Swiss-Prot record:
UniProt-listed GO biological process terms: cell wall organization; cell wall organization or biogenesis; proteolysis
Gene that specifies this protein: ripB
Assigned EC number: 3.4.-.-
Catalytic site positions: C152 (nucleophile), H201 (proton acceptor), E213
UniProt-recorded name of the protein: Peptidoglycan endopeptidase RipB
């Protein structure tokens, strides 16, 4: 999907308010690298049955549920803007898409700001490896099994779900979920990635050389200076504005 233009963004759909996250567009600044945050290992979920067919069915069911949850959140967001996407009878999007409806281009900037507010509402929430659902913090796996919180990819997935945009769970997949943009052209709301193929960490760009992240080294959701060391060649733009 590299360099594919998502214009306008398909939906499938938010809450939360936080002030004080800086507005502006700036080139990511140099800073010392922090500890990379790992994403979930490619292992079968602890709750999934061992039979391959049962595992596949459980995965499909989880995907359908995530799609419907995101669609409902997106309807709430656009409804708040006075945009009616249809009643309960409107068909749900297929698992192969992020939604049956689209964010109007005129509302894209509002959507980006809502994504940032939704992520910012989780400031101070603990870091939990594998943690985070579309609806909020959750227990993770392994080292995060007893901690309710977010890991890096779980936080950004939660943030975008609020406006009806369903992105993949793993940061390496999130890297290819939108249009790739040179870091010098980064805009507020773009995703910044670290490690080969974006597989080691993801953050949400705020502008002015700052980013919002679920940080393993800080142990919580926090705002940090953008680190250039280990950054991927491109940032990813999920919502065009």
């Amino acid at each position: 999907m590299r360099h594919t233009r998502f214009h306008p963004i398909k939906l499938a759909w938010i809450t939360a308010v936080v002030a004080g996250l800086m507005v502006g567009v700036a080139t990511p600044a140099d800073a010392e690298p922090g500890q990379w945050d790992p994403t979930l290992p490619a292992l079968v979920s602890a709750g999934a049955p061992g039979d391959p067919l049962a595992v596949a069915n459980a995965s499909l069911q989880a995907t359908a549920q995530a799609t419907q949850t995101t669609l409902d959140l997106g309807r709430q967001f656009l409804g708040g803007l006075g945009i009616n996407l249809g009643g309960p009878a409107a068909s749900a999007p297929s698992a192969a898409t992020t939604g049956a409806s689209r964010i109007p281009r005129a509302n894209a900037r509002q959507a980006v700001e809502y994504v940032i507010r939704r992520a910012g509402s989780q400031m101070g929430v603990p870091y939990s490896w594998g943690g985070g659902s579309l609806q909020g913090p959750s227990k993770g796996v392994d080292s995060g099994a007893n901690t309710v919180g977010f890991d890096c990819s779980g936080l950004v997935r939660y943030a975008f779900a609020g406006v009806g945009v369903l992105i993949p769970r793993f940061s390496g997949d999130q890297y290819n979920a939108g249009r790739h943009v040179p870091p010098a052209e980064a805009k507020r709301g773009d995703l910044i990635f670290y490690g080969p193929g974006g597989g080691q960490h993801v953050t949400l760009y705020l502008g002015n050389g700052q980013m919002l992240e679920a940080s393993g080294s800080a142990g919580k959701v926090t705002v940090s200076p953008v680190r250039k060391a280990g950054m991927t060649p491109f940032v990813t733009r999920i919502i065009e504005y």
